[in-house]
């Protein structure tokens, strides 16, 4: 029985459309010389923007592996950069966005996930980068010290198809 050439081509074409969506993770890089005192980031997944057109939000899921204990008092900052301008979008307490509790920390040698919800979506532009940083407040420093930081671009929203 001869196999039609149409079926394999159709399968290839369909897979080209769906495989990138199934992958979900986006490219990221560590910020400047700071980066990974607390461990490594393994992937970042950004959900599509939701909410009213004038105030859409996204959810950022950051997955990582802790090489040191990450204290419960750690702060998580989400910011965006457009050229030289940096704007703070949201600040979270670590235990509000992870599996730790206020008495415990994320222990060294464990994997963790940060779920950063209701982050303002500032729109798509090739120059805009989002940044997620873990910061530790100390008595000696006025501003919290960056212990882990990654930059990434939020992908352009996929076009919506509407049939009538």
UniProtKB/Swiss-Prot annotation:
This is MD-2-related lipid-recognition protein 3. It comes from the Eukaryota. One of its GO terms (cellular component) is endoplasmic reticulum. Transcriptionally regulated by NAI1, a transcription activator which mediates the formation of endoplasmic reticulum bodies (ER bodies). ER bodies are rod-shaped ER-derived structures produced by plants of the Brassicales order. Induction: Induced by the diamond-back moth Plutella xylostella and the generalist herbivore Spodoptora littoralis. Induced by jasmonate (JA). Induced by wounding. Down-regulated by salicylic acid (SA). Down-regulated by ethylene. Residues 1-24 form the signal peptide. It comes from Arabidopsis thaliana. InterPro entries: ML_dom. Interacts with RUB1/NEDD8. Neddylated. Ubiquitinated. Keywords: Endoplasmic reticulum, Plant defense, Signal, Ubl conjugation, Vacuole. It is found in: Vacuole; Endoplasmic reticulum. Coiled coil: none annotated. Disruption phenotype: Semi-dwarf phenotype. One of its GO terms (biological process) is defense response. May be involved in herbivory-mediated responses. May play a role in herbivory-associated molecular pattern (HAMP) recognition. May function is jasmonate (JA) signaling in response to HAMP. May play a role in defense response against the pathogens Altenaria brassicicola and Pseudomonas syringae. The lineage of its organism: Eukaryota, Viridiplantae, Streptophyta, Embryophyta, Tracheophyta. Pfam families: E1_DerP2_DerF2.
